[in-house]
């Protein structure tokens, strides 16, 4: 019994030693090297880091960034604490000099109908403000967003702008860079729709200079002066400009003083020079006009008897040219003068109308010739004066018969008229011409016009051999088409030569 009790006590003692002994030993044992510890490691009591290590650790963690940020905030708060952004720098002492530079992101499109163009720019303005000077290791301070509104900014506005858009995504696209010597660089991005007076007299071979003028709105030349920064206009050539019908040819500038009721203001102006690409106008207007004019000459090769065909060709060409002339002015400003394109279309219209007029004259002359030959008169000299009384009665009867015959053009009327009948009807005999002469009051306008035309036009084959045509120009009516086949193309060719030489050299 006793041995069992001793054995149980021994086991209890050993178990107690196993639980307590190892825990005490682990506390005094240093941590293993391969164990990961998060956070600062515990240091043995009584051991301190050197002062140098403490300074470096603080400098690389919190003290150095907080120190710079604090100094920048102190500088900004100091210079803006007593700063009044409503007053310009050097007020009452000297004018503020503002240096200007422009960077062009894109130019165009140019609208000839609205007389305006669009331009996207980054506008730089530089001036000195003694109130913003500071003495520190910081060379510059950059302000953006709403903080810029706490500074004095030149009240520059664009004089010929219709609409101006500033960008505010993701923040307002403006920035102010303050140097330690008080120099301020203000940058803003904007898109401007500006007026551009286009003089379309040489259209479509025209060139234009679109201005962009700016000045101060409230400060005259005694308070604010604008200067070019060596006239630097940077252009982003890699960007695709939306000029469409124009080519950019260059830029120049001008500085002027404009007098207003409130003072004299300095105005700075950029001029963007562009020239038109007239390839589109050539295919849209010039080629159709030329082709229509040449197609109207087809009527010269159509027979005179085909009046309907020749009339349809002439009328169609005239109406087509009228349509082209109207269409060329569709997307065009309502100017009161003729452009180079209008002049070209007008000449083509005149040539087409002359083609139709040539057919009209030819048809009129040949028709009157046939009508006059259809009713010939045979004149008989009087043999006895006693026949006058008898012939007068017959003359009245024949006059009524002739009136009825003229109403029926198909009837061939052959009249025998004596000298007495001519005297009764008012005709006078001319021994030189051997034919009756018609007094002015008894002949209609058509007869007078016909007589005038007979002085220059030969309406009967072989008429140039007659005595009454001697010494006058003889033009054969039936040869008018032959003359026109040569005259019209030559005229149109020389017109094109003169037109393009003058227009391309303007």
From Swiss-Prot:
GO annotation terms (biological process): chloride transmembrane transport; chloride transport; gamma-aminobutyric acid signaling pathway; inhibitory synapse assembly; negative regulation of chloride transport; response to xenobiotic stimulus; synaptic transmission, GABAergic
Renumbered residue ranges of the record's region Disordered: 32-65
Cellular component terms (Gene Ontology): chloride channel complex; dendrite membrane; GABA-A receptor complex; GABA-ergic synapse; postsynapse; postsynaptic membrane
Disulfide bonds: 196-210
Keyword terms: Cell membrane, Chloride, Chloride channel, Disulfide bond, Glycoprotein, Ion channel, Ion transport, Membrane, Postsynaptic cell membrane, Signal, Synapse, Transmembrane, Transmembrane helix, Transport
Membrane topology: Multi-pass membrane protein
Cellular localization per UniProt: Cell membrane; Postsynaptic cell membrane
Protein name: Gamma-aminobutyric acid receptor subunit epsilon
Catalytic activity: chloride(in) = chloride(out)
Pfam families associated with the record: Neur_chan_LBD, Neur_chan_memb
Main function: Epsilon subunit of the heteropentameric ligand-gated chloride channel gated by gamma-aminobutyric acid (GABA), a major inhibitory neurotransmitter in the brain. GABA-gated chloride channels, also named GABA(A) receptors (GABAAR), consist of five subunits arranged around a central pore and contain GABA active binding site(s) located at the alpha and beta subunit interfaces. When activated by GABA, GABAARs selectively allow the flow of chloride anions across the cell membrane down their electrochemical gradient.
Subunit field text: Heteropentamer, formed by a combination of alpha (GABRA1-6), beta (GABRB1-3), gamma (GABRG1-3), delta (GABRD), epsilon (GABRE), rho (GABRR1-3), pi (GABRP) and theta (GABRQ) chains, each subunit exhibiting distinct physiological and pharmacological properties.
Signal peptide as annotated in the record: 1-17
Transmembrane regions: 278-298, 309-328, 345-365, 486-506
């Amino acid at each position: 019994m006793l041995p069992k009790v001793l054995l149980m006590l021994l086991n209890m003692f050993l178990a107690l030693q196993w639980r307590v002994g190892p825990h005490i030993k682990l506390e005094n044992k240093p941590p293993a090297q391969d164990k990961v510890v998060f956070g600062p490691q515990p240091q043995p009591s009584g051991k301190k880091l050197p002062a140098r290590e403490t300074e470096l650790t603080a400098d690389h963690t919190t003290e150095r960034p907080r120190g710079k940020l604090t100094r920048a905030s102190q500088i900004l708060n100091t210079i803006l604490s007593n700063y009044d952004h409503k007053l310009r720098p050097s007020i009452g002492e000297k004018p503020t000099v503002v240096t200007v530079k422009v960077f062009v992101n894109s130019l165009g499109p140019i609208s000839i109908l609205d007389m305006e163009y669009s331009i996207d720019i980054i506008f730089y303005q530089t001036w000195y403000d003694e109130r913003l000077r500071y003495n520190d290791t910081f060379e510059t301070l950059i302000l953006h967003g709403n903080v810029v509104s706490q500074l004095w900014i030149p009240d520059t506005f664009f004089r010929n702008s219709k609409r101006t858009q500033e960008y505010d995504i993701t923040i307002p696209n403006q920035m102010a860079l303050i140097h330690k010597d008080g120099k301020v660089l203000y940058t803003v991005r904007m898109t401007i729709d500006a007026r551009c007076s286009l003089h379309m007299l040489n259209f479509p071979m025209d060139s234009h200079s679109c201005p962009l003028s700016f000045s101060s709105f409230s400060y005259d030349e005694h308070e604010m002066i604008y200067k070019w920064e060596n006239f630097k206009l940077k252009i982003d050539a890699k960007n695709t400009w939306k000029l469409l019908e124009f080519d950019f040819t260059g830029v120049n500038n001008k500085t002027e003083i404009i007098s207003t009721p409130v003072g004299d203001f300095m105005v700075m102006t950029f001029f963007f020079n562009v020239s038109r690409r007239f390839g589109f106008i050539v295919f849209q207007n010039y080629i159709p006009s030329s082709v229509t004019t040449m197609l109207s000459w087809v009527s010269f090769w159509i027979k005179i008897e085909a009046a309907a065909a020749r009339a349809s060709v002439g009328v169609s060409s005239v109406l087509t040219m009228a349509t082209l002339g109207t269409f060329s002015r569709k997307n065009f400003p309502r100017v009161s003068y003729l452009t180079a394109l209008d002049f070209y279309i007008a000449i083509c219209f005149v040539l087409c109308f002359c083609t139709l007029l040539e057919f009209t004259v030819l048809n009129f002359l040949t028709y009157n010739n046939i009508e006059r030959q259809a009713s010939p008169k045979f004149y008989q000299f009087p043999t006895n004066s006693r026949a006058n009384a008898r012939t007068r009665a017959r003359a009245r009867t024949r006059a009524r018969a002739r009136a009825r015959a003229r109403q029926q053009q198909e009837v061939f009327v052959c009249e025998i008229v004596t000298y007495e009948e001519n005297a009764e009807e008012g005709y006078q005999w001319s021994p030189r011409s051997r034919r009756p002469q018609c007094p002015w009051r008894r002949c209609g306008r058509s007869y007078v016009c016909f007589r005038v035309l007979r002085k220059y036009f030969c309406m009967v084959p072989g008429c140039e051999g007659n005595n009454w045509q001697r010494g006058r120009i003889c033009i054969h009516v039936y040869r008018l088409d032959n003359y026109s086949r040569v005259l019209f193309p030559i005229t149109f060719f020389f017109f094109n030569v003169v037109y393009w030489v003058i227009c391309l050299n303007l």
